[in-house]
Amino acid sequence: MAAETSIRKLPSLSGLRHRRNPLEDNPYFHPSNGFYITPSDVILAQVAYDHSAHSQSRVAYHRAGPRREIMYEPSAVKAAIVTCGGLCPGMNTVIRELVVGLWELYGVREIYGIPAGYRGFYSMKAVKLDPKAVHDWHKKGGTVLATSRGGFHLQKIVDAIHLNGYNQVYIIGGDGTMRGAVEIFKEISLRKLEVGITVIPKTVDNDVGIIDRSFGFQTAVEMAQEAISAAHVEAESAVNGIGLVKLMGRSTGHIALHATLSSRDVDCCLIPEMDFYLEGKGGLFEFLEKRLKERGHAVLVVAEGAGQEMIPRNESQKQERDESGNAVFLDVGVWFKSVLKAWWEREHPDELFTVKYIDPTYMIRAVPANATDNLYCTLLAHSAIHGVMAGYTGFVPGPINGNYAYIPLEEVAQTKNQVNTRDHKWAWVRSVTNQPDFETNVKG
């Protein structure tokens, strides 16, 4: 019996008229059989199955790409582009490619950048954009449009979208931004506004679910190598030296994991998904002492969200939230440096010991995207444009198993991509570092 396939339904605008895709007349495209994506073209969420098992239900998403017919008259489009949340390599590339794609592929001429995140919709003047204005933005770090956290006032934002006549809204942001975008999408639907909305997934932590990866992640891993290499040199050049590197990753340890596997200089990698302990048999201190005796140095990589429950904090710190509503994390790197020094002074008061702490957070996220991420940002931007022009709304474009798809925004906003400490990749980390299996030691 054939497996049943469940295709995730995409929201679409019903009040617009079908029209011929202007790509038919674009001098750089020669549409042939297979060029246009059809409603029956889908991407499977999972490509590996147990062939010996009985029929398994399969989940699929609509494939991204240009449609033979579009739902917008390009001359009537007024598009808004906004960047929200923290910086991430590739933000300017996405903006550039949205502008160039709308202009060159579909002939859209009314394209506006919204400054300073969500609050810019109702409190700042939009910036008119065209290919000439953005031609070199992909070479710059940060976001030329500026960004901010917070400022999410739903009614003010949707009022501004309506009053300014925007009928396409392209939002570049991470998990908090997506939760806000879900509310904007619902309010737009409630008001029955014919506005297409999409979110290009941005998070350097790579914690967006369903898609293969978020843009900027590969650049971040590449930049993290420099910090780890520096920590290794510092540790190796000292007597009983420890190089301590804190990498981004509030709730997931993907950057720390991939940077550890890539560098091969790391002796221990600590991530939010894995609990650890310091004292006693099988603890971190015992492991580090053994490593220092064997090699004279060690390199420790820790994701910013690891060990947060171990850091002492007062009542006000427990309740503290940032403007996006996220819990404020204490600096695990500063705490680690302190407890490592206290441990060594207690156990080996007469021996030399050095901890060199490196926090490359702002260096990593503020750089321009590398070549791989630049190409990825282009594909994401163009996928978003094709989807909105086809009349879809409330979706996220992204690769699933290497193929680009459209995923319902609400589904992505509710999903988190965390490191699976039971799979082969985490086992690979432990085989490279030879670090303890803290979980097994605790249970044992």
Curated annotation (Swiss-Prot):
**Enzyme active site:** D205 (proton acceptor)
Compartments, as annotated in UniProt: Cytoplasm
The organism of origin for this protein: Arabidopsis thaliana
Q: What is the activity regulation comment for this entry?
A: Allosterically activated by AMP.
Reported tissue expression = Mostly expressed in roots and stems.
Coiled-coil residue spans: none
- Primary subcellular site in the record, as a coarse category: cytoplasm
User: Quick one: which pathway?
Assistant: Carbohydrate degradation; glycolysis; D-glyceraldehyde 3-phosphate and glycerone phosphate from D-glucose: step 3/4
Where Phosphoserine occurs, the residues are S55
Looking at the UniProt record, the site noted as Important for substrate specificity sits at G176
Subunit structure comment from the entry = Homotetramer.
Q: What's this protein's family per the entry?
A: Belongs to the phosphofructokinase type A (PFKA) family. PPi-dependent PFK group II subfamily. Atypical ATP-dependent clade 'X' sub-subfamily.
Q: According to its record, what are the GO cellular component terms?
A: cytosol
Q: What does this protein do?
A: Catalyzes the phosphorylation of D-fructose 6-phosphate to fructose 1,6-bisphosphate by ATP, the first committing step of glycolysis.
Cofactor(s) the protein needs: Mg(2+)
* Signal peptide start and end residues: none
**What class does this enzyme belong to in the EC scheme?**
transferase
What GO annotations for molecular function exist for this entry? 6-phosphofructokinase activity; ATP binding; metal ion binding
For this protein, the Enzyme Commission number is 2.7.1.11
Kindly state which reaction or reactions the protein catalyses: beta-D-fructose 6-phosphate + ATP = beta-D-fructose 1,6-bisphosphate + ADP + H(+)
Please state what the protein is called: ATP-dependent 6-phosphofructokinase 2
List of residues binding ATP: G86, R149, G150, G174, D175, G176, T177
